[in-house]
Amino acid sequence: MKVLVSVFNNLYTDQRVEKVCRTLSEAGYDIELIGNNWGGLPEMQRPYPFSRISLKSKSLKLAYPEFNWKLYQELLKKADKNTILLSNDLDTLLANYLVSKKLSIPLVFDSHEIFTEMPAINGRFTQKIWRILEKFIVPKLKFMMTASESYADWFAKTYGIERPTVVQNFPVKIENPQNYSEINLKKVILYQGVINPSRGLNKMIPAMEKIENAEFWICGDGPKKEAYLALTKTLGLQEKVKFLGKLLPKNLRDITKKADVGLSIEENNGLSYFYSMPNKVSDYIQARVPVVVSNFPEMGKVIDRFQVGEKINSHNELAEKVNIVLERGKIFYEYALNKAATELCWEKEEPKILALFRKVTQKHF
């Protein structure tokens, strides 16, 4: 059975799509992945064929329609009656939906987030366009999965649909990588991810004034990097706040396990953030690093269930909660982190994907 997977990115850093493709490929599905050249064409290898559609548009508002038109043509060329379409996020859905209807083949929609509630489009005209598209297609879908329990509840309630299958974007399980005899002379507080607004970084940098004998490492790049570098300099915190830039996945894993606490301190700037389970939380947990997180539904549930760190209800609590975790130390959380790592891993999510695709196959072939 052929599965044509499409996503609006250059494929290189999309871990969810890579894991889903690998899971399906290892289960015997014939996978082909289609992305684009938005963000460059980094070299990569995969055990299944992939291609990247060339986009001429320089702005996203033009790139989205260009991609969907070219994707529509590409899918028509590659699909046959023994094909399942797998559309990732709303920005690939129109092309997939039209091909699905034209060829009478099944479509699975994987919504990694609530696209229409992303902070980047909040209050903009483009948000209205995406909402119209979402409202038109999502209620017609028979097979859908999404990345958090709260997302699934939102889609079911908003569109009156059967609750989507929840496939959390957890990392592959790793054995405890910690060497507890290695102790940082200065404690390491870690943030990994894009340096965007609403990630709480502009609150954490000043909070470092109240945290002694520690450094704040920011791993990633993004539109707010220069502003946060300037803030660090203005506060005279260059010795306590380090910008490590965008790292290769292996280097990031090596740095993550050195951390004494990992942060996921998003601000409530839209439902997509509020209902998310950020990848970095489970990445920290697999590295056996305790966490400080915003008390949003999904992250809060992890702390309540596994006791792997602290929650903040306000960014005013940052220094206090980070200091609690640092004073307790990593060994204090070892048992809880090992238990959480066994549950919050990709191996627990794979059966849900395979069950969904078995359902698609049984109903259509």
Enumerate the language-model features and the residues they cover.
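Nucleotide-activated donor-binding/catalytic signature segment of Leloir-type glycosyltransferases, i.e.
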Residues: 226-254
